[in-house]
């Protein structure tokens, strides 16, 4: 979706992508810079009951098994691999490619009781 060198600032809008394979699940992405590091978030345009499972299967089809999947491993590695850390985020899985670290995130706002799942990616440090 992105080449890291192309992200030089914060996006002012989200970008939507039609999923021709599964029209029920359309993507939305946004990008921004944190301490000079580009960050991309990809989510489904409409949350569904199967969002976590669907995003996992999507990433699995692209990258196979996650590098980190046990809760303790994921938590420990997330802080080492990612620059943009939000206290409301709980990483579920982490994949690593030649150029990127990719996490499947559970985000929860306890004040509003809102849960979201999304993919977050950053270039390898």
What are these regions (language model features)?
Residues 1-125:
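A cross-family detector of function-defining hotspots
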């Amino acid at each position: 979706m992105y080449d890291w060198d192309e992200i030089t600032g914060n996006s002012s809008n989200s970008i939507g992508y039609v999923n021709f394979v599964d029209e029920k699940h359309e993507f939305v992405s946004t990008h921004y810079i944190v301490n000079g590091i580009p960050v991309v978030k990809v989510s489904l345009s409409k949350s569904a009951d199967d969002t976590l499972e669907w995003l996992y299967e999507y990433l699995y089809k692209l990258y196979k098994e996650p590098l980190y999947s046990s809760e303790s491993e994921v938590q420990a590695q997330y802080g080492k691999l990612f620059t943009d850390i939000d206290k409301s985020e709980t990483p579920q899985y982490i994949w690593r490619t030649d150029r990127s670290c990719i996490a499947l995130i559970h985000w929860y706002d306890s004040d509003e009781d809102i849960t979201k799942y999304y993919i977050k990616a950053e270039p390898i440090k």
